Amino acid sequence: MIALIQRVTRASVTVEGEVTGEIGQGLLVLLGVERDDDEQKANRLCERVLGYRIFSDAEGKMNLNVQQAGGSVLVVSQFTLAADTERGMRPGFSRGAAPDRAEALYEYFVERCCQQEMNTQTGRFAADMQVSLVNDGPVTFWLQV
């Protein structure tokens, strides 16, 4: 399971002209589900995403996680993160989970974020989405479990 996390000052996702999720300061989480992923991996990745210390403390050091910084989380499914790009000029998607399984694990990940008392917003699974963000830093990390 993969999370591409970006520290943002604001982010939103729109589906068919409707804003489905919007946050101020926090994390935009682009979530990719791979073929062998399960709830245990989703739990571990959620723990890492919410615990990752990429927000500045009083001394300006990256020392606070999103909860400590008072931020929110916007989770957007992105199957292309599981692409095989090692050869050729076209990505392959055999590493990605089947759509039903990917959706179930995406929803599970979102629920785990909510259970941690995070203000959690979402996109819409498998939809054509427009994601807008202001990357703060820029600060972007690839987390994989």
From Swiss-Prot:
It comes from the Bacteria. It holds the Pfam family Tyr_Deacylase. GO terms for cellular component: cytoplasm. Its main location: cytoplasm. Its EC number is 3.1.1.96. HAMAP family: Deacylase_Dtd (MF_00518). This is D-aminoacyl-tRNA deacylase.
